[in-house]
Amino acid sequence: MLEITLLGTGSPIPDPDRAGPSTLVRAGAQAFLVDCGRGVLQRAAAVGVGAAGLSAVLLTHLHGDVLITSWVTNFAADPAPLPIIGPPGTAEVVEATLKAFGHDIGYRIAHHADLTTPPPIEVHEYTAGPAWDRDGVTIRVAPTDHRPVTPTIGFRIESDGASVVLAGDTVPCDSLDQLAAGADALVHTVIRKDIVTQIPQQRVKDICDYHSSVQEAAATANRAGVGTLVMTHYVPAIGPGQEEQWRALAATEFSGRIEVGNDLHRVEVHPRR
């Protein structure tokens, strides 16, 4: 069984009720933080997960809204290196983040006798193929389409016969269909293009170019034959009592289980027999 927790269901648009985009996937004793938008460390703390409890951080792309909480560490005296898996460019972003916190790191090393080095991090960059295989949990990567943001990737996590695919920001594409084929669950970002296109600001309308609508995400789930569609990264934010509107739109393209939730919404994923 895999457990999905929507830590942050928001978008780059500030929302007092939604943290930035991030999803926690638990696979047995392992836990993976997929993207890490603003406020996600607080959301992770709410479900009892700290930096020391993470097996790895997985980044689908390098847009700022999924990187705001990229400073993930703990106060252990000798922590194991934290793996960060992302597309090419991830190492540069991590290096820049460590540099930005250089003064803070120096202050803490000077203050605490048991801290002698910056936090250990292992960066692994992928565009496709296997990315993880430990203790019965595997992760596979495939390219997605969020151009002009490139490269971008999605992740397929498998454990004990259950599988979940995390698409990140993307428009429909063959590589995502292939990655998600037969998965038990697909976590997909969604926007309401019918609403966004009515906003009289071109920069806002532009986001329709490289995100999937609710119906497009649902059609991807249908083509891939997944069991459950989990929607997240809602643009605009879902208001109270509006969840059924979004679910109904998805249901026009996908007849399986559809999950729409606020931050901290949990979904259990079991292998389909």
UniProtKB/Swiss-Prot annotation:
Binding site for Zn(2+) 2: 169, 233
Classification via SMART domains: Lactamase_B
Key word Disulfide bond present: no
Keywords from the UniProt entry: Endonuclease, Hydrolase, Metal-binding, Nuclease, tRNA processing, Zinc
InterPro entries in alphabetical order: AtsA-like_MBL-fold, Metallo-B-lactamas, RibonucZ/Hydroxyglut_hydro, RNase_Z/BN
One GO molecular-function entry: metal ion binding
Alphabetical list of Pfam families matching this protein: Lactamase_B_2
Reactions the enzyme catalyzes: Endonucleolytic cleavage of RNA, removing extra 3' nucleotides from tRNA precursor, generating 3' termini of tRNAs. A 3'-hydroxy group is left at the tRNA terminus and a 5'-phosphoryl group is left at the trailer molecule
Binding site for Zn(2+) 1: 61, 63, 146, 169
EC number(s) given by UniProt: 3.1.26.11
Obligatory cofactor(s): Zn(2+)
UniProt cofactor note: Binds 2 Zn(2+) ions.
Family: Belongs to the RNase Z family.
Entry function: Zinc phosphodiesterase, which displays some tRNA 3'-processing endonuclease activity. Probably involved in tRNA maturation, by removing a 3'-trailer from precursor tRNA.
Assembly with partners or alone: Homodimer.
Protein name as annotated: Ribonuclease Z
Gene symbol of the encoding locus: rnz
